[in-house]
Amino acid sequence: HPELAESLMIAKQFLYLKHLTFEGARRRYGELNEQILKRLDYELSTIEWMGFPGYFLIVWDFIRAARELGVSVGPGRGSAAGSVVAYSLGITNIDPIKYDLLFERFLNPDRISLPDVDVDFDEDGRADVLHYVVEKYGSKRVAQIITFGTMAPKAAIKDVARVQKLPLSESNRISKLVPEKPGTTFEKAFKEAPELLAERESENPLIRATMKYAEQLEGSVRQTGVHACGVIIGQDDLEKFAPIAIAKDAELNVVHSV
């Protein structure tokens, strides 16, 4: 039965995680006092209940491999620094007991959310870590994440103007009317720049057409790219769950939305 098989898998993962955690905790703290034991028991039971033993094992494994490969690894950022389990595993290098950091900011049984460990590798060593992950899990189960660049008003005007063969001077003049603010849409731009709105009713038919088609193209995908950091590891071939592409400059396959 699939659900039983998954439960057994999580149980095995948890036993190994628990073993590694206590092994690491003894290296970090020496003798484990009542405070540390209580904290470890609470964190491990939360991780088991939320079904994340496998996640911790994967992160532990590639960080361990990175250090063995001589790759510089950051001390850990964000809420993961509040986990004694993560500290014991060597995922982070900040002692949550010493600095009184809260585990609940990382994982909270009352607020179901995915764990997020921010891991930093040196720029030169990142490729070595990726290579290790691909070798371990297989190239069909590891992929980077595609990104989509969409048409903003300024770019839409310039692209349409070029196709419409509108003179470059006019194209530049109109596009400069768009406010230089992040997240600007045509709707917002028309409110802030009435002179841009007036171009819709221009006496020049090429300008009217340019404005019309630029508005229609706003938000359309203009180009694709690869996420700077994100990597997906699947328990099965990723093509079973999402479309896969081969990016020109990517080190791996890239996956569309999952």
Model-inferred region functions:
Residues 1-258:
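Alpha-helical scaffold/interaction cores of sigma-54-like transcription cofactors
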